[in-house]
Amino acid sequence: MCIRDRCCISPSSTILHYSVFKDYGKFDESLKACEDYDLWLRYCAFEKTHFLGEQLTIKNGGHSDQLSQLYWGMDRFRIYSLEKLLQNKNLSRSNYQLTLTELIRKLKILMGGSIKRGNIELAEELNKKIIHFQGLLEDE
């Protein structure tokens, strides 16, 4: 399952059959960013992906018009997607545990950034979530 760090699948370098969208849904339009991460989480939790061994695309990042440049705390969107994935009753136990682990990791990163920027209220809210999800992980 591809959940670590950033999305490792680029939509512009992907070939999908239209049935993928029928089976796993489309991009979540309620997300302002990371909607591709959300889709790949849903897909990779149940399907295998195949990567070509050679690099066929050139990725250029960091442009001012990229969504990652427009919004603070991009992990907020990834956290939302991970929480949403946990609600899927068909998620295997191992993928449930992987998702919980990654969710806790991202919550800690966002909490650290919140503390660094003096947003104590958000940090406290995130800490409550961390405690909650750590409890779920320990119950596994």
Task: Describe the predicted segments one by one.
Residues 3-81:
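Conserved nucleotide-sugar donor-binding catalytic segment
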Residues 55-62, 68-93, 117-136:
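Catalytic core of nucleotide-sugar-dependent glycosyltransferases
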Residues 88, 103-106:
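GHKL/Bergerat-fold ATPase module in large chromosome/replication-associated machines
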